[in-house]
Amino acid sequence: MARTAEITFKEFRRRYNTEDACRAELFRLRLPNGFVCPKCGCVEYYPVHGRNIYQCRSCRHQTSVTAGTVMHRTHLPLTLWFWAIYLCATDKRGISAVQLSRTLGICYDSAWHLLDRIRTAMGQRDEKYLLSGIVELDDGYAGGPSHNGKRGRGTDKAKIVVAVSKTANSAPLFARMKVVDNVQGKTLQEIIDQYFVPKTKVECDGYRSYLNLEGVELNTKKYETDDLHWVHKAISNLKAFLQGTYHGRCTKLQAYLDEYCFRFNRRMTGNQIFLRLTRAVATSCSVLC
């Protein structure tokens, strides 16, 4: 079976049913060109039996397939990690820590830890990509119920900025979402500088904070609600995702946005999304280092 093909549930169970199989897959994904010592660059190593680590033949530096990733210093079996990755990747609705703990037979804290690290890898992976071409840009609000009864820009919900790139024929491509403290011009400019390719064509609703953005080709037309179809659809679907899976809670909202975008940006990959997410986890950077 080709590594790039979709992986079925049956194939997943067959391929990743042991610690050694999971470790070999992480080695392949993290070191596609073979072992390279992170300390001295030597390509020769030998395994330290019984400890699941590799030792450089030159400088004797020891490392593992999880060192320096979001799995750094994990005490959970790799098979549990792979199950969590598979369940998180293949369920379009996402999976909560409560459900994951029940499915895998682990405590809530372990399930929460797994999902938190996996979402971190999702966010890191999408940080590598910039939006280009034509991009719809708008701000919105997400999280639990508003306590002051207000809607729109006066609400007390968490503020988010959402961007969706699209083709010339208006087919959606990629999405980025960011939790922000405000939607002032300076904040929006920082998002443009971080997430957009220079000279990208931006469509927005004409709110004054958007009018002086630099580095992009800003369409000064005042777009109505129906004109920014994809960005508003993304915000609507995000709210349904948060409400359905996480019951609207705002805790670690940015991580939930990263999860939503990762899945949206790979919506055409079918079950390949599991392999994409496994690669993201294997090549991630530790939040502990």
Predicted regions and their residues:
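Residue-level recognition of single "structural anchor" positions
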Residues: M1-C289
